[in-house]
Amino acid sequence: MNFAKISNELGFQGLEYLQGSYAGGLFGRKKEITLKGMKELAMDLNKRAEDYGMENILIMIDIGPDLGSKVDNLDPYYPWIDCASEMNCHSVRVNLRGSDDDLSQWTQNSIENLSKLCEYAKPLNINVIVENHGGFSSNADYLVNVIDNVNHENVGTLPDFGNFCIKQDPKKSEEISKLFIQGGKKDSTRPPTLYDTCAERFDMYDGIEKLMKFAKGVSAKTHGFDSNGNDVDIDYKRMLQIVKNSGYSGFIGVEAQAFTMDPIEAIQASKKLLLNSYS
């Protein structure tokens, strides 16, 4: 609940909320949240944002049925779209990972489910945006095809610099997970990152360029830093030039995954890299 305060102290201006952090979310103690509880949450977060002069940008939804799969109902999503509207956010972010290897079925399911959410969100002036976030959704060509076939103006993307891993290497994932728990190898010249767990990936620069056409937000992810403060996996100057060339002028969110660092220090290093690279 100190999100607005800490973000303000770190020099940020906008807030992207992780729905899983609140009641009814992925990490919340309560499995569900009532309509009354949702309104109270929105009022509380609005007050905190206002107190610190912050702008509410979007809510990232990580609970509910997989939108890349066949879904009976989308009820878990609707309260969070309502909440985003109450908080004057412009978007909710959803995922389209899918649960099998059937590309055709994933495409059909994704189009149908996104269309339904967009229909619900449109009267509330909320965009429904998709992040490249694993599985088929990390293949920019596949995701662009889905967005192209959702006939709603309030559909879009949230391109993430580092999320182009289509398939994980189970052994490497286990190794990195252990390092994550331990805090990583702090004396390493190149810190281990989640990028190392990937067995199949889409080219990140090509992917960002393709997804920026539909972008209503951007997630600047960092994996780790070298001695010069540059990301060890991502060429930030190249990536941000792609963002600039697209004509995008909205907020750029900071997401730090440098698990060998203190979280606040990683966020500060990410912000510094972002500002230094955006020239």
List where the protein language model places each region.
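Glycine-rich, proline-tolerant flexible connector loops at the mouths of alpha/beta enzymes
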Residues: 16-46, 98-102, 227
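Active-site acidic/histidine proton-transfer and metal-coordination neighborhood
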Residues: 4-5, 40-159, 165-166, 264
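C-terminal helical cap(s) of enzyme catalytic domains, especially alpha/beta-barrels
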Residues: 263-279
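Hydrophobic residues within beta-strands of alpha/beta enzymes
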Residues: 15-16, 57, 92, 218, ...
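Catalytic domains of carbohydrate-active enzymes, especially glycoside hydrolases
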Residues: 1-21, 87-90
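A structural motif
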Residues: 12, 54, 89, 215, ...
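Acidic/histidine-rich catalytic cores of soluble enzymes
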Residues: 4, 14-15, 111-241
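Short acidic/histidine-rich active-site segments
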Residues: 251-258
